[in-house]
């Protein structure tokens, strides 16, 4: 098998293994389960990975990508309709909750916790990029929108972990209120009107 095909197949296997971990749980999933899910002979997964640890960490990174792409994909598609955007984020959080719980199980694991931290740090470093991009869309400063981005991320994370709307709704409603204010201010600016003296 060529290296390109091996790399492509490895990506496919990571996605399948992540689904398997999400379904069965981190500690209950065996290498045999992963091989079966990936349609490999027993032990065949080690042609693509050296150790189970490597598989787990690759799946954790894939989980981060799924959650990040799911959330920010909605934001940049729907930010012109903030009410709809927030509703869709809630639906996405429902869907991604099992994936987030797998990720949390990796993060709190004695075996993998320290080793997954670099992937989490890379994610955190991208928040400033998203903040600037959202600020540009809303025609405001990054400083104005940054607390709202972090509040929304916190709300989504809490909801995906605990599946409790009572934790999620107040935070999301607070973020939505301020985002709507910024969107309305942008609209007034574009119309040449600054009601109430706000700039």
Q: Predicted segment positions?
A:
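Amphipathic alpha-helical packing segments from all-alpha helical-bundle domains
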Residues: 68, 72-73, 95-98, 112-142, ...
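Short, basic, alpha-helical segments at the C-terminal edge of helix-turn-helix-like DNA-binding modules
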Residues: 61-67
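Hydrophobic alpha-helical connector segments
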Residues: 58, 71-96, 142-152, 192-194
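Hydrophobic alpha-helical segments that form the core
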Residues: 142-165, 171-182
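Helical hydrophobic small-molecule/effector-binding pocket
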Residues: 82-108, 113-114, 188
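N-terminal intrinsically disordered/low-complexity leader segments
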Residues: 1-8, 191-199
């Amino acid at each position: 098998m060529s290296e390109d095909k091996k790399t492509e197949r490895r990506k496919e296997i990571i996605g399948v293994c992540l689904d398997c971990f999400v379904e069965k749980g981190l500690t209950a999933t065996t290498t045999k389960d992963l091989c079966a899910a990936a349609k490999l002979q027993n032990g065949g997964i080690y042609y693509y990975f050296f150790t189970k640890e490597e598989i787990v960490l690759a799946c954790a990174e894939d989980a981060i990508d799924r959650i990040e792409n799911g959330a920010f994909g909605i934001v940049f598609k729907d930010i012109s309709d903030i009410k709809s955007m927030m509703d869709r984020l809630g639906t996405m959080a429902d869907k991604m909750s099992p994936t987030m719980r797998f990720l949390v199980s990796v993060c709190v694991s004695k075996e993998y916790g320290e080793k997954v931290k670099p992937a989490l740090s890379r994610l955190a470093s991208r928040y400033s990029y998203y903040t600037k991009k959202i600020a540009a869309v809303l025609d405001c400063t990054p400083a104005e929108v940054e607390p709202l981005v972090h509040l929304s991320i916190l709300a989504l994370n809490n909801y995906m972990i605990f599946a409790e709307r009572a934790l999620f709704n107040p935070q999301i409603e607070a973020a939505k209120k301020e985002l709507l204010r910024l969107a309305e201010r942008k609209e007034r600016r574009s119309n040449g009107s600054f009601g109430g003296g706000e700039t």
